[in-house]
From Swiss-Prot:
Source organism (scientific name): Clostridium perfringens (strain SM101 / Type A)
Record gene name: ispF
Name this protein carries in UniProt: 2-C-methyl-D-erythritol 2,4-cyclodiphosphate synthase
Gene Ontology BP term (one): terpenoid biosynthetic process
Catalytic activity field: 4-CDP-2-C-methyl-D-erythritol 2-phosphate = 2-C-methyl-D-erythritol 2,4-cyclic diphosphate + CMP
Cofactor note: Binds 1 divalent metal cation per subunit.
Length: 156
């Protein structure tokens, strides 16, 4: 068994869609990034790659490569899932947290979980997504950005 941990953060800006867990969430701002800036999926991918000792998302999807400009992170997650399969890893579970003052994430979490399960071709009960605020503290608490953390367990 192998444990992996992932973290990602992006700044909130105007004129961008807010996409988390592959879900477009209605909000006046979105996350700034080279791809769709889906911090949840990016943290999950980093935890999976880390557990398998396969590097991180920057190795496979560099922000200097124009082909990843505006990339759909669900497609990137599918690639990571295929890479794990090729290396004989099975996902035991994923537990992820979104840290954001606003908007409320609870209504969107079931769809996020479904998207992740489908992209990785695993059962829904292997994925947990939760959200919290930082009670107005720090950059996420003041609404400047959103971050996400993920931990996973892989079996070979």
């Amino acid at each position: 068994m192998r444990i992996g941990m992932g973290y990602d953060v992006h700044k909130l800006v105007e004129n961008r869609d807010l996409i988390l867990g592959g879900v477009k969430i209605p909000y006046e701002k979105g996350l700034l990034g080279h791809s769709d800036a889906d911090v949840l999926l990016h943290a999950i991918m980093d935890s999976l790659l880390g557990a398998a000792a396969l590097g991180d998302i920057g190795k496979y999807f560099p922000d200097t490569d124009p082909k990843y400009k505006g990339a759909d992170s669900i497609k990137l997650l599918e690639f990571v899932g295929e890479l794990l399969n090729k290396n004989n890893y099975k996902i035991s579970n994923i537990d992820a947290t979104i840290i954001a003052q606003r908007p409320k994430m609870a209504p969107h979490i079931p769809t996020m979980r479904e998207n992740i399960a489908k992209a990785l071709n695993i059962d829904l009960d292997k994925i947990n997504v939760k959200a919290t605020t930082e009670e107005g503290l720090g950059f996420t608490g003041t609404g400047e950005g959103i971050s996400s953390q993920s931990i996973c367990l892989l079996i070979k």
